[in-house]
A protein has these predicted regions:
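Soluble or luminal CAZymes and related metallo-dependent hydrolases
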Residues: 6, 26, 51-58, 121-129, ...
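A structural motif corresponding to the C-terminal end of an alpha-helix
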Residues: 129-140, 286-290, 321-324, 387-388, ...
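Short amphipathic alpha-helices and their capping/turn segments at secondary-structure boundaries
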Residues: 59-75, 132, 195-196, 247-251, ...
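Leucine-rich repeat
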Residues: 88-285, 289, 301, 306-309
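Leucine-rich solenoid repeat modules
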Residues: 14, 298-302, 308-446
Length: 446
């Protein structure tokens, strides 16, 4: 018996239980019967390796001509990987006026806008094709975008979605959209954070990822959102290579109950704004009863351990009042107030952490007072049974590797000063892990 002998019902079950979407696509390409049967399954997940008008225009025509395929699309990744559209595809933008005109007419607000939009589509511009396509996918739940500037068509479409304007005047905007990932198209500058607020307003949104987000306070799409509070169901924000001097206040206060926040501050080629940990603590305080995971550190992918900011080693702020917080990952320099005090810092580490703590990770461990920090960790482990009953893991990261000793050996001075801490962790049943972070790579050391 071959695959061609299997009944349609069994083939559909195989496709439904297949975790690798590429395998489903390969199966659909075996013969015309399989393609006709599995076409809707194939369209549930679309991944453009390289985003270009050739691909966008063909997909847009397809979902307009076949509404059942538009209904099938759940995941759409729009060229977030680095690369370029093949040269053979660049001049081949598909534009069939009779097919596109109803969709453009439904989205445009004036005849002049409609005419300009049609011209932009014919010219093969990515932004107008993206803005036209997205509202055509009513069941889209996961979206990955590579954003450019100024992206005026997409910004306009998002603004209309927030305000319930045409084409969203008869149906709710993006009712199934749960996850959005936005990546900047270049290696400099970044995505203005005000451009991202409209995504937070969609009813099903729960998770937002952003790469190279730069905080701004200008009037982006739907500027009225800048002053609104708790209108978003987003629970998870993950920002890498980001720059935010003021603590992303309007993004964080938009959320009703944030559960996870990850912020990795970028090097200076993206922005020269200061790295100010204290302002993030203030912005996160409204979520002290819901926040479960916090990661806040510097991006050292380029081997830079510092931003050059005068505020980068400031105390993040006390976390004891964050009653749901279970995982904390901070720079060692930010977890204590090192600015004053007889011991070189103010307050004890154990006093700054929440009772629900399960995992504590300290980054750039080598850039603080090693003896003082180890003593604080020893005190933390010593009282863990009573104050932190769920604490199971402590992770230490930094420049800890001794290249001269070979293998993955730790520097002798680090081994000496942490020997007692290791013993205390072992006796308390706490897994103490040591990681060397170097040039964007992380590996275990002992």
């Amino acid at each position: 018996m071959t695959l061609e002998d299997l009944p349609n019902e069994l083939l559909l079950l195989i496709a439904a239980y297949n975790d690798n979407h590429g395998d489903t696509l390969s199966l659909a390409q075996c013969c015309r019967r399989f393609y006709a049967l599995l076409r809707q399954e194939v369209y549930t997940s679309i991944d453009f390796t390289y985003l270009c008008p050739w691909a966008l225009s063909r997909l847009t025509h397809t979902v307009i001509e076949h509404p059942e395929l538009a209904q099938s699309v759940r995941k759409l990744s729009m060229g977030v990987r680095n690369g370029y559209c093949p040269k053979s595809h660049r001049p081949n933008t598909k534009y069939h006026a009779a097919t596109l005109l109803p969709a453009v007419s439904a989205a445009a607000h004036t005849p002049d806008e409609q005419q300009a939009w049609q011209k932009a589509l014919q010219c093969g511009q990515i932004d107008p094709w993206t803005a036209l396509l997205l509202p055509l996918l009513p069941n889209l739940s996961q979206l990955k975008l590579k954003l450019d500037y100024p992206a005026s068509y997409l910004n306009r479409m998002l603004e209309r979605a927030v305000r319930g304007q045409k084409p969203f005047d008869t149906t709710p905007p993006f009712p199934a959209l749960e996850q959005v990932s936005a990546t900047w198209h270049d290696h400099e500058n970044g995505i203005f954070s005000s451009r991202l607020l409209p995504f937070f307003s969609f009813p099903a949104m729960r998770r937002f990822q952003g790469h190279m987000v730069v905080e701004d306070h200008i009037a982006g799409p739907a500027p009225e959102l800048l002053k609104r509070r708790e209108f978003s169901g987003v629970t998870d924000i993950d920002l890498t290579a980001a720059h935010a001097e003021q603590g992303l206040g309007y993004l964080l206060r938009a959320c009703r109950g944030l559960k996870s926040f990850r912020y990795v501050h970028a090097h200076a080629s993206i922005s020269l704004k200061d790295f100010n940990p204290t302002r993030f603590h203030r912005a996160l305080e409204p979520h002290r009863e819901t926040l479960e995971r916090l990661e806040f550190r510097l991006d050292d992918g380029f081997g830079w351990g510092s931003t050059g900011s005068e505020r980068e080693d400031d105390f993040f702020g006390p976390l004891a009042g964050f009653t749901a917080l279970r995982e904390v990952a901070l720079r060692a320099a930010n977890i204590l107030d090192w600015s004053k005090g007889d011991d070189g810092f103010v307050g004890a580490l154990a006093e700054n952490l929440p009772r629900a703590l399960r995992v504590l990770a300290l980054d750039q461990f080598d850039q603080c007072d090693l003896g003082a920090m180890v003593a604080q960790l020893e005190g933390l482990v010593g009282c863990a049974k009573d104050r932190f009953p769920d604490l199971g893991t402590i992770e230490i990261q930094g420049d800890l590797h001794d290249a001269g000793r070979g293998g993955r050996s730790m520097k002798e001075e680090v081994v000496g000063v942490t020997e007692r801490l290791r013993g205390l962790c072992s006796a308390a049943g706490i897994d103490c892990r040591w990681w060397n972070r170097e040039g964007g790579y992380t590996y275990a050391v002992s």
